[in-house]
C-alpha cells in the first residue's frame, strides 16, 4: 500500500509545535510520507524522526526552501512567519497526486485517511469554511490538494502573481488562495478544522452560541490566532489536548499503548478536590496560605481581565489555575467539578457568583472582610483566622468524600 502524503511548513521556532502535531497524527495512523517545507530545521532532527517513524512504515522528508522569493510578502499578523507562503510550492515538492496540507498549530484526534478518498467534485482544492470569520471563504490551515489539477491550471505560478499584486491588501497566503479559488473549491465537514483560537474573540463579540455550534471533539483542532495552548494564558477549548500530545512519548505512540485512549489528566494526575474564586482584583486575601495548606485542592481563579503579577507569581504552586478573560464555557467547566467556593476576593462580587454557588448547593467559605453573601448559609471567619478556615475546609471535604464522588 502506498504512503499518504502529508505536508507541513515550519521554521526552527516552531519545531516543537511541529513535532507535537506529528505525534497526534501518527498516534492515529501509519504509512505516512510527511514533507516538511522549511529553511532551517536541523538535519539531525529529520534523522531522529525517520528512525522513529520507520516503525510506523512512515517517513519525513526535509524539503529545503529558499526564503528569497517569500520574504518580501506582507504578513497579516506578527505571529505568522513567511514560511506560511511555502505551501505555494507543494506541487513541485511532493510526488503523490493527493496531498494533505496541515498547519503546525493543529492537533489531530482521529485517522485522516478519509480525506484522501473524498471526491472534490472536479475542484483542485478541498478545505473547511473559515468559521467564524466568514461563511463563504475557507481557512487555509487544512487543504486537500489535487496535484494534477494544480499543475494543469498552473496554480503555483498564478499564486505568486496574485501575491506580488495583492499581498498588502489581503490576509496573507490564505487571502491569496481565496482570491484565486473564489467559489471553485470543495467544502469539507467542519470537524476537519475547528478554529478554537476564535473562542476568546467570539466571547468578546458577544457570540455566546459559538461554543455550542460544534458538539463533541473534532477530528482536527486548530489553535488559530495569538491564543495558542502553549502560552501561559488559558483562553481556548481543548488546551489540555495539545499538552496531552506534547507530553506523550514517541515510544507510547510507536507501541500503540492503551495510554493513547486516555487524557492529559491521566498523564499528570487529577486533583482530589476543586475550589474556585471569581475576582476583579489580584489582591485575594490569604490565597497563598490556602495554596500551601491545601495542596490536594485545585484552586481555580477566574477574572474578566488579565491578572496582576502578584497573582501570576503564585503559579509556582501547582494547585493554582488562572483563567484571565474567562468565557462562559470555561466558567461552566469549572463549576461542574467544584467542591467548595472561596469567597475571599475583596471589593465587588463578580457575576453574582455566590448566588450561582448557592443554587448548586455548594458550601461557601469567606472572611469577614470579603463576604459577599447577604442571605444564605456561609462559613465566615475573621480576617486573621485562615488556619481555622483551612481546618473547616478539610473537615468538610473529608465528610463529603462519598457525596462528591471524590476518590
List the model feature ranges, each with a label.
Residues 1-4, 8-10, 17-20, 147-272, ...:
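A glycosyltransferase accessory/donor-loop signature
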Residues 53-92:
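Active-site-proximal specificity loops/subdomain of glycosyltransferases
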Residues 99:
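Short aromatic/hydrophobic "clamp" motif used to bind/position activated sugar donors
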Residues 108-135:
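Conserved donor-nucleotide/metal-binding helix-loop-beta segment in metal-dependent transferases, i.e.
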Residues 304-305, 320-334, 350:
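Conserved active-site histidine-acidic residue motif and adjacent donor-binding/catalytic loop
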Residues 336-349:
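Acidic donor-binding loop of glycosyltransferase active sites
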Residues 363-367:
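Short hydrophobic beta-strand element within catalytic cores of glycosyltransferases
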Amino acid at each position: 500500500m502506498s504512503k499518504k502524503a502529508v505536508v507541513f511548513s515550519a521554521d526552527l521556532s516552531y519545531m516543537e509545535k511541529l513535532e507535537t502535531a506529528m505525534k497526534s497524527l501518527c498516534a492515529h495512523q501509519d504509512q505516512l510520507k510527511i514533507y516538511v517545507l522549511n529553511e532551517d530545521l536541523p538535519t539531525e532532527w529529520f534523522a531522529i524522526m525517520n528512525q522513529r517513524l520507520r516503525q510506523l512504515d512512515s517517513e519525513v522528508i526535509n524539503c529545503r526552501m529558499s526564503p528569497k522569493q517569500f520574504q518580501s510578502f506582507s504578513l497579516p499578523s506578527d505571529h505568522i512567519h513567511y514560511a506560511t507562503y511555502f505551501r505555494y510550492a507543494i506541487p513541485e515538492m511532493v510526488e503523490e497526486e493527493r496531498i494533505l496540507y496541515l498547519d503546525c498549530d493543529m492537533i489531530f484526534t482521529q485517522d485522516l485517511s478519509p480525506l484522501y478518498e473524498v471526491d472534490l467534485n472536479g475542484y483542485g482544492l478541498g478545505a473547511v469554511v473559515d468559521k467564524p470569520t466568514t461563511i463563504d471563504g475557507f481557512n487555509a490551515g487544512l487543504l486537500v490538494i489535487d496535484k494534477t489539477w494544480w499543475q494543469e491550471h498552473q496554480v503555483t505560478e498564478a499564486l505568486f502573481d496574485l501575491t506580488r499584486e495583492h499581498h498588502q491588501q489581503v490576509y496573507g497566503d490564505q487571502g491569496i488562495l481565496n482570491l484565486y479559488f473564489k467559489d471553485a473549491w470543495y467544502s469539507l465537514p467542519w470537524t476537519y478544522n475547528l478554529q478554537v483560537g476564535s473562542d476568546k474573540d467570539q466571547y468578546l463579540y458577544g457570540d455566546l452560541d459559538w461554543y455550542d455550534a460544534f458538539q463533541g471533539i473534532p477530528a482536527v483542532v486548530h489553535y488559530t490566532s495569538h491564543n495558542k495552548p502553549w502560552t501561559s494564558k488559558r483562553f481556548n477549548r481543548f488546551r489540555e489536548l495539545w499538552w496531552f500530545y506534547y507530553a506523550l512519548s514517541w515510544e507510547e505512540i510507536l507501541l500503540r499503548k492503551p495510554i493513547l485512549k486516555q487524557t492529559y489528566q491521566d498523564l499528570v494526575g487529577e486533583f482530589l478536590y476543586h475550589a474556585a474564586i471569581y475576582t476583579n482584583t489580584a489582591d485575594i486575601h490569604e490565597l497563598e496560605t490556602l495554596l500551601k495548606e491545601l495542596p490536594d485542592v485545585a484552586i481555580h481563579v477566574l477574572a474578566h481581565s488579565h491578572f496582576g503579577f502578584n497573582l501570576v507569581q503564585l503559579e509556582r504552586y501547582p494547585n493554582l489555575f488562572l483563567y484571565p478573560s474567562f468565557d462562559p464555557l470555561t466558567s461552566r467547566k469549572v463549576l461542574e467539578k467544584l467542591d467548595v467556593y472561596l469567597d475571599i476576593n475583596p471589593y465587588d462580587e463578580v457575576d453574582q457568583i455566590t448566588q450561582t454557588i448557592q443554587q448548586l448547593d455548594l458550601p461557601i467559605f469567606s472572611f469577614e472582610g470579603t463576604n459577599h453573601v447577604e442571605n444564605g448559609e456561609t462559613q465566615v471567619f475573621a480576617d486573621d483566622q485562615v488556619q481555622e478556615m483551612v481546618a473547616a475546609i478539610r473537615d468538610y471535604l473529608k465528610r463529603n468524600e462519598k457525596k462528591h464522588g471524590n476518590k
